[in-house]
Amino acid sequence: GGTHDTKQAIFNGLDLEFGSWTNGLSAGTKNAYDNYYLAYPYLKLIKEGRIGIKELDEKVSNILRLIFRTSMSTLKTFGSLGSPEHGQVGRKIAEEGIVLLQNKNNVLPINLDKAEKIVVIGENAIKMMTVGGGSSSLKAKYEITPLVGLEKRIGLQAEVVYARGYVGEPIGEYNGVKTGQNLNDDRTEDELLAEALTVAKDADYVIFFGGLNKNEHQDCEDRDRKQFDLPYNQNKVITELAKVNKNLIVVNISGNAVDMPWVNDVPAIVQGWYLGSEAGSALASVLVGDVSPSGKLPFTFPAKLEHVGAHALGEYPGNKEDLAHSKNWGDTINTTYHEDIFVGYRWADKEKLTPLFPFGHGLSYTKFAYGKLSVDKRSMTVDETITFTICIKNTGTCEGQEVVQLYISDKKSSLPRPVKELKGFKKVRLAPGEEKEVTLTIDKEALSFFDDVRHEWVVEPGDFEAIIAASATDIKKKVKFALK
């Protein structure tokens, strides 16, 4: 876990120590209380008179205060968990998080006025992902799958045909929680592919829902992925579908990057994430154009696995040390991240690598124009702020949202620094033809970095550059300023 010292935890603001066990590695232990830093070791210090109970009282007060403000609040009415209003909020959040990675020839949004047959292919179109167990699995009252979401939205406007395409993990169970789904299918890969190609040939649109899932060595706890490629023969299915239908849309359901060797053959690619209860409804809204996509990637999709720091430096999979107390959890692998602070887009910038899709990337169904960038001062002191202003205009034909990103580049530093770092962003909604001013303000914290020798945050006078961008590689405007 993240706690490693009892006294540090006591005197530096930690109120509640979380964790299933004690070290994040073992599958369970009978003496867990003895090993939590804020459990028996804390009690022992108090009993021995080495510390008082002032901090303990503060921690208990903080926890109780939160409980009374939330679960024990008198304003919290019966039935307020998982209400329709919660569903509406969940759907809106899901819609705004969906990322349009690629859209050649404006295949998206789907034109329901002209489409007669829409084919949906892929196990992830029907597989439940939000079934309990923690993290993004959660425990939800319901989950709308992509296929159901599309069928409900399209209704009688077009025929929706489904084919499995591939079989991944037919079991409907995650972390001991059962979905009730039975996805068993005894057909061979060739039989599944043949069916998919047959129904896809004459379709107006083909939507492939693939990616990863929550099973072992996928997007799960404890076990790393075994491959960067999509599993379960998906790459072959996508490649063959692209040969028979020019309007192929791939929706990747995953929590992290995957290899896309077919990227040049597929016109439209959507990053669909794990979107919760309203996943299917949100994806349908974006695919048919009810909502213009406005999500941005929170990490880099590398062009190849060797473009990731740990792999480029030969550190992964590292030294295989079995640190687990229980063999049920398998071997634990220690990897030393010698790329240091140069992770994600910072590594790509440093090594001058071209990613498949960069950090901060995300397309829209409309277009945005970036105007002149202005700054309220050319130099600042450590006690001042500096504000950048830019005009953004929707030059397209539909409403949309753009995420304006502010990166800062430190031109000279006593320690190695990234080429640039994201220090602010703002999302702006614009009607067709509308324009708005977007302002982003930073202070000295945005110019600071951690000095691991002095063991403190420092800010050094010098020259900086503010970069306004639509992604880590889509630079729009720059302006220089100084810290005195």
Language-model regions: role of each:
Residues 414-452:
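Intrinsically disordered, low-complexity Pro/Gly/Ser/Thr-rich segments with frequent PxxP/GP/PP motifs
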Residues 397-414, 420-422:
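Short acidic, flexible loop segments centered on an aromatic residue
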Residues 15, 116, 204-206, 267:
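Conserved acidic residues
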Residues 1-33, 44-55:
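Second-shell residues forming the walls of enzyme active-site clefts
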Residues 34-36, 43-134, 138-147, 151-156, ...:
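Secreted, periplasmic, or luminal enzymes acting at the cell surface/secretory milieu
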Residues 80-83, 163-245, 250-265:
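Hydrophobic helix-and-loop "lid/oligomerization" segment in the mid-to-C-terminal part
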Residues 441-470:
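Short, surface-exposed ligand- or partner-binding patches at beta-edge/loop junctions that are enriched
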Residues 10-24, 185-188, 268-280:
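Acidic, His- and aromatic-enriched active-site or binding-groove loops in soluble protein domains
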